[in-house]
Amino acid sequence: MDVDKLIEAGKIAKKVREEAVKLAKPGVSLLELAEKIEGRIIELGAKPAFPVNLSLNEIAAHYTPYKGDETTLKEGDYLKIDIGVHIDGYIADTAVTVRVGMEEDDLMEAAREALESAISVARAGVEIKELGRAIEDEIRKRGFNPIVNLSGHKIERYKLHAGISIPNIYRPHDNYKLREGDVFAIEPFATTGAGQVIEVPPTLIYMYVRDAPVRMVQARFLLAKIKREYKTLPFAYRWLQGEMPEGQLKLALRTLEKSGALYGYPVLREIRNGLVTQFEHTIIVEKDSVIVTTE
């Protein structure tokens, strides 16, 4: 593990996150915001670890704009900005919620304080359920619900989700003990809704899973490009727009998804259309504390 690269990726992610917050003003288009954020990551010498997620209001995650997307920010919107940065596969993952044109409110504070609380109990030997407990307590005591089917995640080189989750609720069976050197993203989500997300169209983010035989020439071409450029990290539909006519691109992606070569991430919406906030940091676990790489 290259700690220096993890820390450098975290510094860049923090800088870009702070700049993104200042750009999120009424009237700004999501497409313009996404292109500025991802462009800035590259300018600073890193690469996006995944397409920037710009999820509004009841949309919790996995929305990234497409070319031609005319969505603009309105005053009072809850905008979740989720940014991934990597240097040579070493990832920093961080998120912030902005209330466009307005001050922080209780719903935002709930997710932010939940994140701080989870970080404060994290160190080697602590069971993951204790982080879930810390998150759930902070959110519920403010009268909101944690989103039960979204969670933080272990991170490995070129692997955004490395198999172990940090839930946003206390679950007695979550007995995995944090180990020195573990890298985790902790990301509480708070909502005014029921505390659950469902998948809704469209799918705007994909990830390479494995090779699979496909007959469509364009699909084979696309798969080779995806493997070469993005490896096992998620990528945006937007990043491929212009590679081929739109109809062919959609068909090629559908073909690759159906074959099992790609995994699609549909947009996630709160089941009762509740408003959603999110805050996130990446940590490296140490014996008696953690390094927060994105702080």
From Swiss-Prot:
Annotated protein name in UniProt: Methionine aminopeptidase
Co-factor binding details: Binds 2 divalent metal cations per subunit. Has a high-affinity and a low affinity metal-binding site. The true nature of the physiological cofactor is under debate. The enzyme is active with cobalt, zinc, manganese or divalent iron ions. Most likely, methionine aminopeptidases function as mononuclear Fe(2+)-metalloproteases under physiological conditions, and the catalytically relevant metal-binding site has been assigned to the histidine-containing high-affinity site.
Cofactors that this protein relies on: Co(2+); Zn(2+); Mn(2+); Fe(2+)
Classification via HAMAP family: MetAP_2_arc
Binding positions for a divalent metal cation 2 per the UniProt entry: D93, H153, E187, E280
Gene: map
Pfam families: Peptidase_M24
Subunit structure: Monomer.
Function field: Removes the N-terminal methionine from nascent proteins. The N-terminal methionine is often cleaved when the second residue in the primary sequence is small and uncharged (Met-Ala-, Cys, Gly, Pro, Ser, Thr, or Val).
